[in-house]
Amino acid sequence: MDNINGLPDDLLVKILSFVPTYVAVSTCVLSKRWEFLWMWLPNLEFVSPWDSRPGIVDFINKKLPIHRAPVIERLCIHINSNPHIKPEYIKRWIEIAVSHYVRELQIDYHSKTKITLQLEAESYFIDGKYLQQLISGCPVLEDLSLRFCCNDNLREFTVIIPSLQSLSLFLFGNSNLNRYKIDTPSLKYLKLEDWNDPEHYSWTNMPKLREAYVDVESSNHLKTLIGSITSVKHLTICCLEDYLYGDGFIFNHLEHLKLCMCPFDSSNLLGQLLKGSPNLQVLDIFEMKRNDIVCWNQPSSVLECLLSSLKILNWSAYFGRPQDRDIAVYILKNACHLKTATFLTDKRINDVRRLKMIKELRLSPRASSTCQLVFGEDF
């Protein structure tokens, strides 16, 4: 013990940084000198086995405000179903973390109202009440993730962040959220899962967007969003309502499109997206799992992307229904530069039907003499 006590404080703090936070804290009983050494740690994790202890909330409330490290590199707090926690505690923890120039912040809290918080300098996850305050304290924020769950008291929120490059929004059903505004001119990546139908939403200023994942319930939301994501190179899209989003939207940079065709048939949406994507190279169709018979409205003329750019077609959960076959045959017949077309049949289809579907596709005409058909089973 005398040997280690002879080391400078900076080196002792460095040593403590290699052990879990709860172990580092336990060294405070060794001597007067060790009482506050752990409070210089730049990384703090109040997680298992601490998260289940009754006094963890009081400990954080008492010690975090007097933490001595000028910069907190990482603060991680996981608290599950603790009756002693209050929203104002979380607010205070956020304020303290921001005041210490936190680089990475995670707060996971599950309460009876299903409010979950997780914040990081690259991926922020927070209840909306304190969102604006947090954003104002992070002027160079690049990655933001928001999750608003059922029974939220949140009514509206605004995200205006000039520096933001990645945004993930998870807006789950039965939320009281009815309006939000997004203004992110530097955004490169967007992930949106919105299962609500807010009264008003505004998406503006995303000229640098390169990749987007869009899963929305309302076609109205899709219509509002579509004009702001036309700069993407990679687009994944799923909409519960098969309605067209309007004319005049061209995805000149779109190279890779993934379209979810369930739970409602989205053949009309597929046709419009193909029509507006003249440089598309890869088309993925997936999760088409309903048996509704909906006609494929074949375009009156051959789409530009089929004539000039489409090289790869991947179709997962292929059912071989009439409209499925019509879409597949249309693409094979007109895609002049198609290299591979992969069809993974749904595992629930029996062997006789599967062989029939494969035969239909093998016998269909192909515009590309070098196109290879690949068949398999979707697991």
Swiss-Prot record:
Stored InterPro entries: F-box-like_dom_sf, F-box_AtFBL13-like, F-box_dom, FBD, FBL13/AtMIF1-like, LRR_dom_sf
Highest taxon of source: Eukaryota
Domain FBD residues, every copy: 295-345
Positions of the F-box domain: 1-47
Designated name of the protein: Putative FBD-associated F-box protein At5g38570
Provenance organism: Arabidopsis thaliana (Mouse-ear cress)
